[in-house]
């Protein structure tokens, strides 16, 4: 039993922190790094998915930098202000900023766009109350 406990501690000590060089401090949730156009999921302080390519807010509609809670999820949402689909939306600000599927080759009105497959993974693995950290 003692050997099992020691082995488990050794394995945990070698687990890579969630992109430590990025400055992301999320323990459970997601990190976004705008200057590299990447995002990743974090579980128990370790990167569990990604990094993946993203698109984020264009000038005048910047994706806000900071720490936010996941607020809600909507499988097939529609943006009324921008008249467009928001599949796999995971909202993390009260003014409508979310992760969702969309074109990665153009900038957004503040949301974080993901590929179809990545948006499904983020949708299925982020939950209300978990954290999203957006880095410059």
Describe the residue ranges of each PLM region.
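Exported/periplasmic cell-wall-interacting domains
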Residues: 21-27, 58-67, 72-136
């Amino acid at each position: 039993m003692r050997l099992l406990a020691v082995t488990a501690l050794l394995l945990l000590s070698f687990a890579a922190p969630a992109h430590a060089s990025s400055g992301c401090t999320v323990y459970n949730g997601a990190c976004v790094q705008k200057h590299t156009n990447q995002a990743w999921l974090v579980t128990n302080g370790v990167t569990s998915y990604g990094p993946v390519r993203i698109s984020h807010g264009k000038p005048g509609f910047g994706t806000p930098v900071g720490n936010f809670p996941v607020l809600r999820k909507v499988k097939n949402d529609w943006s009324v202000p921008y008249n467009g689909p928001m599949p796999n939306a995971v909202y993390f600000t009260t003014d409508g900023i979310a992760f969702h599927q969309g074109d990665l080759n153009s900038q957004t009105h503040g949301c974080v766009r993901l590929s179809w497959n990545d948006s499904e993974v983020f949708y299925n693995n982020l939950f209300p109350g978990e954290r999203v950290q957006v880095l410059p």
